[in-house]
Amino acid sequence: MEENLKGLYAALLVPFDENGQVKEEGLKAIAKNAIENEELDGLYVNGSSGENFLINTEQKKQIFKIAKEAVGDDVKMIAQIGSLDLNEAIELGKYATELGYDALSAVTPFYYPLSFEEIKQYYFDLIEATQNKMIIYSIPDLTGVNIDVDQFGELFNHEKIIGVKYTAPNFFLLERLRKAYPDKLIFSGFDEMLIQAVISGVDGAIGSTYNVNGKRSRQIFELAQQGKVDEAYQVQHETNDIIAKILELGLYPTLKEILKYRGIDSGLPKRPFAPFNEENRAALDELVNKYNL
């Protein structure tokens, strides 16, 4: 197992201006906030929380570069390169590897109903081209792709496929994976189910709300690992109250607005996402003040 990659990661948010361009200084500040203020172990860059599937190849490269330069070489870095265009994914993977990212990750190909053999070859092609370590990004609610225990085994047979970012509510499958593949990394991808994932034996977690609520997430992770389940649940309950309100107000716009309370130029969501609704400002003020966000 890649012990050095265990831990808690921010699924990095990306600030955009009104024209959909990346705000470089804002991105640096968001990256530094995750490590220095939220005390996380690393960054997961260009995933769903970075609105990755709304941006072009050059913007993805720009984000990889800025994020890496912002936090330096001592921070764990995972580059999400998944794309429906295999050539783009390879190009991004080579670029992130050259920048010194510790591992790559790639969402399962979506939209087209591919066979498992086609999906497996997609990952093998990425590894062959980049020669970097790979973490499968499984998020079936958004991709429609469900991989079973035996199919994960076929993927994990490749020595460079070191684990999975598991963003699914199926804890039976998670338990089966943990039992079957004890030497592979499993990262939880659902912030609101962190305690259940830790009890199931995950090695770390990657989350969007960790950008603003990372310290509570670490409390949950460490308390649950220590067997202090009741205490961990108290923090998870509080965290889920926060998450429920953020989801009600709009996930990405609200996370970015919370960062603005910290003086970070966190910009706008990328269209077609709508900006934060100012009619919800009083509710957000209350949330930030109540939970010291």
Swiss-Prot record:
One GO molecular-function entry:
N-acetylneuraminate lyase activity
Query: Where does the source fall among the domains of life?
Result: Bacteria
- Reactions listed under catalytic activity: aceneuramate = aldehydo-N-acetyl-D-mannosamine + pyruvate
Q: Which GO terms describe its biological process?
A: carbohydrate metabolic process; N-acetylneuraminate catabolic process
Query: Which residues take part in binding aceneuramate?
Result: S48, S49, T167, G189, D191, E192, S208
Checking InterPro entries in the record gives: Aldolase_TIM, DapA-like, NanA, Schiff_base-form_aldolases_AS
EC class name: lyase
Tagged with keyword Ribosomal protein? no
Broad class of where this protein is predominantly found: cytoplasm
- Annotated pathway: Amino-sugar metabolism; N-acetylneuraminate degradation; D-fructose 6-phosphate from N-acetylneuraminate: step 1/5
Q: Which EC number(s) does the record attach to this protein?
A: 4.1.3.3
Q: Where is the signal peptide?
A: none
Question: Gene3D superfamilies of this UniProt entry?
Answer: Aldolase class I (3.20.20.70)
PROSITE patterns given for it? DHDPS_2 (PS00666)
- Provide this UniProt record's keywords sorted from A to Z: Carbohydrate metabolism, Cytoplasm, Lyase, Schiff base
Q: Which residues form the active site?
A: Y137 (proton donor), K165 (schiff-base intermediate with substrate)
Question: Where located?
Answer: Cytoplasm
**Its function?**
Catalyzes the reversible aldol cleavage of N-acetylneuraminic acid (sialic acid; Neu5Ac) to form pyruvate and N-acetylmannosamine (ManNAc) via a Schiff base intermediate.
According to the record's subunit comment, the protein's assembly and interactions are: Homotetramer.
Q: Which family does it belong to?
A: Belongs to the DapA family. NanA subfamily.
Name of the featured protein:
N-acetylneuraminate lyase
Say which species the protein is native to: Staphylococcus carnosus (strain TM300)
